[in-house]
Amino acid sequence: MLNRKEVHNSETLNIQIDSHDQKSYLIELCKDCTKFDLNVECLENSFSKFFILNHAENACELNINMVLKQDANCQMGVLDLEKSPLKWNHYVDLKEQGAEYEILSGQLCQEHIEKVCDMEVRHNAPHTNGQMKNFAVIKWLPMEISKKDVSMLSLIRQRVY
């Protein structure tokens, strides 16, 4: 069963995926969304999927904090095609052995619209797996794009510990 959530203005959502449970979430950041905090704890042997779709028309802040316990598996997708700034902080703690996390994200980056993503997947136990696949499409009217322009358009920092 798919759990749906529409986010308006500034909201916080706390989710716990119970042991041996399976959950799927579709989260839509609505046009009036300015800030969304998502806190998720995936307990032992759980399986979860999250898809976050940004529709915010103005600057928005997205904060995601996840903790995965032993043999928990979580897959996440984030899609941001809006012509508005996005500040995205994403932190994942793989706390116990066997925890697995995968994120696939796509962003449309345009001139003078700042998209900043700070993403960390921290391996706090042996035999954990974390994968980050981030894609950015750069839409720019002039055909010449310098390295400086690209860095101003989209700043993505990934760290694996």
Regions found by a protein language model. Name each.
Residues 1-161:
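Conserved beta-strand/loop scaffold segments within soluble protein domains that form the structured core
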